[in-house]
Amino acid sequence: MSKLFWAMLSFITRLPVPRRWSQGLDFEHYSRGIITFPLIGLLLGAISGLVFMVLQAWCGAPLAALFSVLVLALMTGEFHLDGLADTCDGVFSARSRDRMLEIMRDSRLGTHGGLALIFVVLAKILVLSELALRGEPILASLAAACAVSRGTAALLMYRHRYAREEGLGNVFIGKIDGRQTCVTLGLAAIFAAVLLLGMHGVAAMVVTMVAIFILGQLLKRTLDGQTGDTLGAAIELGELVFLLALL
């Protein structure tokens, strides 16, 4: 299990992981690593939350929120934000399915993708600032948001098909079973409940699950499946929805 965790940490983040810690794990077995997604999210959110706490006393909540969101993006190599932008460029192009997938593969940033990036990043900064002003625990909120968003991404993998013939998303999409999905969601729920005492965290997770499930169904209808880009979009939107639900 530890080898699987380190492999997933190296796969979906840019955090330095010694190669020997995940050596010997076949790429085809990576789908089993979905259950580690909430734990990886917890780690990323905790680091981002620590950045907020350190900077808040020095430069105030808005700038602390700005840098915590920046650090979170850098730790993932902007991988999920890129998926969000590509998904919006493709889906909102109002073209045929095949053309949408072509647009999503294009490395150039379009108007829809640019607007989505600005909106999501700015919204995260504003929501974190507002939560801080209301006295909410930012470290716990960010840790829970990142854990839940990565856990609920399993909803776009279970019983979904991969929309392309090849790509990194094919490692997970359609490859995880019901037990893995339940364990992943269960871990995310436990983290949310423990970090945000009472039902506040669990309620926010329920809202996030509903939003991501609906997103998955809409993308399935539009693209006839999911891609690595749509998973990234789900994670980014999941973080935002969870934080909004805490307000």
UniProtKB/Swiss-Prot annotation:
Task: Specify whether Ion transport is a keyword of the entry.
Answer: no
A Pfam family (short name) is: CobS
Might you give the EC number(s) for this enzyme? 2.7.8.26
| Cofactor(s) of this protein | Mg(2+)
Tell me the membrane topology, using the record's own terms.
Multi-pass membrane protein
GO CC, sorted alphabetically, is: plasma membrane
Transmembrane residues, as ranges? Answer: 34-54, 57-77, 113-133, 138-158, 194-214
**What's one GO BP annotation on this UniProt entry?**
cobalamin biosynthetic process
| Broad class of the protein's primary localization | membrane
Q: Where in the cell is it found?
A: Cell inner membrane
Question: Catalytic activity annotated for this protein?
Answer: alpha-ribazole + adenosylcob(III)inamide-GDP = adenosylcob(III)alamin + GMP + H(+); alpha-ribazole 5'-phosphate + adenosylcob(III)inamide-GDP = adenosylcob(III)alamin 5'-phosphate + GMP + H(+)
* Function in brief: Joins adenosylcobinamide-GDP and alpha-ribazole to generate adenosylcobalamin (Ado-cobalamin). Also synthesizes adenosylcobalamin 5'-phosphate from adenosylcobinamide-GDP and alpha-ribazole 5'-phosphate.
What family does this chain come from, according to its entry? Answer: Belongs to the CobS family.
Sorted alphabetically, which PANTHER family does this protein's record hold? ADENOSYLCOBINAMIDE-GDP RIBAZOLETRANSFERASE
Task: Spell out the protein name for this chain.
Answer: Adenosylcobinamide-GDP ribazoletransferase
Specify the species. Answer: Shigella flexneri serotype 5b (strain 8401)
**What is the gene name?**
cobS
